[in-house]
Amino acid sequence: MFLRHCITFTLIALLAGCAGFGSREALQGHGDPQQWRAHKAQLSSLDGWQINGKVGIRAPRDSGSGTLFWLQRQDYYDIRLAGPLGRGAARLTGRPGGVVLEVANQGRYEATSPEALLEEQLGWQLPVSHLVWWVRGLPAPDSKSKLTLDGDSRLASLDQDGWQVQYLSYTEQNGYWLPERLKLHGKDLDVTLVVKDWQPRQLGH
């Protein structure tokens, strides 16, 4: 069960690279489209961050919660889970072309992509590269999305590839307004993320 929890969240949290975003968006809500575009352009410049927070997972057969540490440096990631989510700790590291999952007292798992590792370990197909965008309050650029803006022209919710993401609150860090509480709902899976500490960075290319 622990491995199931760890793979579920950490693989959703992976990326396929920080490419530029397209215009496959359907906008609605109370925000101003021009302000949204400016906000999106600012957030897309972030290619590094450190996050500390909590994550909860609900699935038909099991559920749990734990602490999250996520270090992102361009295309390199280091994601760690610990606490009641399982009986130990998990660490996921890698970059495009190579992913390593280490689970305390259970083993080490490798794949060429997070999608491949998820498919191999669980047999699930999920948009695992999207959360690197969603966690910043952006839609993933490679598929269509339906966006609802709040009164501050930030995302209140988005629908993309069969997932619904709700943005419950934001926090301001270093001039960036970033999601603080998110709820993600997919087929047979709900994920709640509460960010306690955001440290955004622009590392350059």
From Swiss-Prot:
GO biological process, one term: protein transport
Residues with lipid group (N-palmitoyl cysteine): 18
Pfam family, one: LolB
Keywords from the UniProt entry: Cell outer membrane, Chaperone, Lipoprotein, Membrane, Palmitate, Protein transport, Signal, Transport
Compartment(s) where it occurs, according to its Swiss-Prot or TrEMBL record: Cell outer membrane
GO cellular component terms listed in the entry, alphabetical order: cell outer membrane
Assembly and binders: Monomer.
Function according to Swiss-Prot or TrEMBL: Plays a critical role in the incorporation of lipoproteins in the outer membrane after they are released by the LolA protein.
Protein family per UniProt: Belongs to the LolB family.
NCBIfam families with a match to the protein in the record: lolB (TIGR00548)
Protein name per the record: Outer-membrane lipoprotein LolB
Source organism: Pseudomonas putida (strain ATCC 47054 / DSM 6125 / CFBP 8728 / NCIMB 11950 / KT2440)
Gene: lolB
